[in-house]
């Protein structure tokens, strides 16, 4: 149960003074629904209001706090005109300007003849000193409250600084003193304050440098967040190791048949990955392993060989893909090999006919089907296995944790292999999975040629179209990707449709269009026409599925490449170069290019190594944006910056390991404090869900 002391932090933000239902909705959108969410919403800038000149000495552009006497209100006749309030001190006059100002409100705020302290940005307009909508107007006895460095918080539409500052200040006040969960020697070495003092300090910066992620207060809080995350992962890992697993040993007879039917040798890293998986499956503990392989590195084959270990042991295995296109593709790759090895394989998707579905469900339940490939249809309640030994989940950041769990729970202590084509930098791997066992596929299969990557200004699009014409005349196939502009799906669609129209005029009957609004069946028909060569050019917004395999595709054109992230560019480029023919990737960009965009395109030209590209992407963009953490299954860090805090992440991992060695049930005095930490960062539910791997 959550410690009693944390109760005030887990109240709704509407329990804070000044936050009613309307503001509550906006605050929830900004930071989250609970008081604790506001604690993690740190300021990104400061405003120094300590400068208090007389009117005559106030300079344009500076933030000033000035004490004045209110003289007169000039109420506009026309509501479009500004409302002006003239004030003065001994040195000169100051005009306070309000647009859409209400007379009753302003006369109450600034009563004529009274002294007021105003703070805001100074402007000089037609020789007059002026402030438009001052940030603060208070009586002289509240002057000291304004004369300070003020934190500036990120906002969402409809919110202003004042209520957010007030709500966060109250949230910090309500935060309890908690028992220290950090290792005493480690904290002393870093010269860090206690949790509560660090929190108060992070929300009350004195100058710009206090906003650095390396400032002691911020570093302390970042470490706490990382420790909670690493400890949650380590606890689950420990729990999984103590739960008796399936000992699954194969004798190699089925795999030998498959390997004989391959027209090529496995790469060294494919062999190593299969060896690691085989050793894991033979252990009494449950396997949870990540198979990381760049686009086109042969993950499906490794997955098949892993699944066949289960079949050799007399059990079953399942592979779950995020989309029907991918499930069908995996099935098509595996089917001839399964047939050659005498293994019964089925496909299960949401669009199967009743008769076929019934047969598949029957075969899985009685064990006559050995392998199944499917979409999330596999996790439906009606799906039962006779004896599921291995669950393989492809492109896992598309699945919610509960879907991974659901597939794993279709048997007893099912081994889990998670495949991803997204090369994740080491730091992010550690943050997301702790010490998860990882197999990496680093080489491309034999016979694949390097891709010729070029950057070309958009003005030369005519030459690109001519080059595309030459490619398709020789039987090549071309992807043409139009960028996704986040704000508007309509604009994207218009861009893609316009490009489709222009290319169709050049190459009638040869061009297809693929975008997010097409129904599943239309998308699949278009993809099939392209794969079979009835279409030579496929114009698409970025919905070309990860893993879609068209070996005859030799050219990838990406319009406005400067708008894409590195990981995305790399994923798209991986759609070509999958056959033996020479392939090219043409990155079209609009001038002038910003520094980051320049660096991104340069890296694309230099290397095809997805792991190096991922590290560069982390360096250029920071972890938050890297994979769009929200959809990626990676933890959504509020305080830690994985690029800046890589060393703290390592330290948090080491500390979590030590805790598990010494006190796996968190029963000691420090253990009790660490439980509070897990609740504070809401890792109590993560402890439950992470059992899915």
Task: Enumerate the language-model features and the residues they cover.
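C-terminal accessory region of SF2 helicases/translocases
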Residues: 580, 584, 592-693
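Short, surface-exposed secondary-structure boundary micro-motifs
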Residues: 69, 121-122, 561, 575
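Short boundary/loop segments of OB/S1/cold-shock single-stranded nucleic-acid-binding domains
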Residues: 44-64
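Long, highly charged, low-complexity intrinsically disordered interaction regions
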Residues: 1-17, 25-26, 228-229, 239
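Inter-lobe coupling/hinge segments of SF2-like helicase ATPases
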Residues: 267, 272-275, 285-603, 612, ...
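Structural detector for short beta-strands of small beta-barrel domains
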Residues: 60-81, 120
């Amino acid at each position: 149960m959550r410690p009693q002391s944390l109760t005030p932090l887990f109240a709704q933000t509407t329990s804070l003074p000044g936050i009613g239902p309307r503001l509550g909705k906006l605050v929830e959108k900004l930071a989250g629904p609970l008081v604790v969410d506001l604690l993690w919403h740190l300021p990104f800038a400061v405003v120094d209001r300590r400068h208090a000149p007389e009117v005559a000495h106030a300079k344009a552009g500076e933030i000033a706090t000035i004490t004045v006497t209110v003289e007169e209100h000039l109420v506009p006749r026309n509501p479009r005109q500004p409302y002006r309030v003239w004030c003065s001190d001994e040195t000169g006059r100051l005009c306070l300007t309000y647009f859409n100002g209400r007379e009753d409100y302003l006369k109450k705020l600034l009563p004529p003849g009274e002294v007021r302290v105003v703070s805001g940005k100074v402007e000089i307009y037609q020789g007059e000193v002026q402030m438009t909508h001052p940030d603060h107007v208070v009586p002289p006895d509240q002057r000291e409250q304004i004369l300070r460095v003020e934190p500036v918080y990120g906002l969402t539409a409809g919110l202003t600084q004042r209520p957010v500052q007030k709500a966060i200040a109250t949230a910090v006040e309500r935060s309890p003193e908690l028992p220290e969960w950090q290792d005493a020697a480690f904290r002393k070495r870093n010269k860090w304050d206690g949790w509560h003092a660090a929190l108060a300090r992070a929300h009350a910066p004195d100058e710009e440098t206090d906003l650095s992620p390396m400032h002691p207060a911020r570093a302390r809080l970042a470490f706490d967040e990382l420790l909670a995350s690493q400890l949650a992962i380590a606890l689950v890992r420990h729990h999984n190791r103590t739960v008796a697993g399936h000992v699954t040993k194969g004798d190699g007879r089925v795999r030998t048949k498959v390997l004989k039917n391959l027209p090529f040798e496995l790469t060294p890293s494919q062999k190593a990955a299969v060896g690691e998986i085989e050793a894991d499956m033979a252990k009494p503990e449950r396997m949870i392993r990540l198979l990381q392989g760049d686009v086109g590195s042969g993950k499906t084959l490794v997955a098949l060989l892993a699944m066949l270990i289960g079949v050799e042991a007399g059990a079953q295995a399942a592979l779950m893909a995020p989309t029907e296109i991918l499930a069908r593709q995996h099935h098509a790759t595996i089917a001839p090999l399964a047939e050659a090895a005498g293994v019964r394989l089925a496909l299960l998707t949401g669009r199967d006919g009743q008769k076929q579905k019934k047969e598949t469900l029957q075969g899985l339940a009685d064990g006559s089907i050995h392998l199944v490939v499917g979409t999330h249809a596999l996790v439906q309640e009606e799906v039962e296995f006779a004896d599921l030994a291995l669950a393989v989940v492809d492109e896992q950041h598309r699945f919610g944790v509960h879907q991974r769990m659901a597939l794993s729970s279709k048997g007893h202590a099912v081994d889990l292999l998670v495949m991803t084509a997204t090369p994740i930098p080491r730091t992010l791997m550690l943050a997301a999975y702790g010490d998860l066992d990882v197999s990496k596929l680093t080489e491309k299969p034999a016979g694949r040629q390097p891709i010729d990557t070029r950057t070309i200004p958009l003005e030369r699009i005519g030459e690109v179209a001519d080059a595309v014409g030459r490619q398709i005349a020789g039987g090549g196939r071309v992807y043409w990707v139009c960028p996704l502009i986040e704000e508007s799906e309509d604009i994207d669609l218009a861009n893609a449709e316009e490009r489709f129209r222009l290319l169709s005029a050049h190459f009638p009957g040869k061009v297809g269009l693929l975008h997010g609004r097409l129904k599943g069946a239309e998308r699949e028909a278009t993809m099939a026409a392209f794969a079979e060569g009835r279409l030579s050019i496929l114009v698409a917004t970025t919905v070309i599925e990860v893993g879609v395999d068209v070996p005859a595709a030799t050219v990838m054109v990406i319009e406005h490449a400067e708008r894409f992230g590195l990981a995305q560019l790399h994923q798209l480029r991986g759609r070509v170069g999958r056959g033996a023919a020479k392939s090219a990737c043409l990155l079209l960009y609009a001038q002038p290019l910003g520094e980051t965009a320049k660096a991104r395109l340069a890296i694309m030209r230099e290397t095809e190594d997805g792991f190096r590209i991922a590290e560069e992407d982390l360096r250029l963009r920071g972890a938050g944006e890297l994979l769009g953490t929200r959809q990626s299954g990676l933890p959504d860090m509020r305080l830690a910056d994985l690029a800046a805090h890589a060393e703290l992440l390592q330290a948090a991992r080491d500390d979590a390991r030590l805790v598990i060695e010494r006190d796996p049930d968190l029963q000691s005095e420090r253990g009790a404090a660490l439980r509070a930490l897990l609740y504070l960062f809401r890792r109590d539910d993560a402890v439950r869900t992470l059992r899915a791997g």
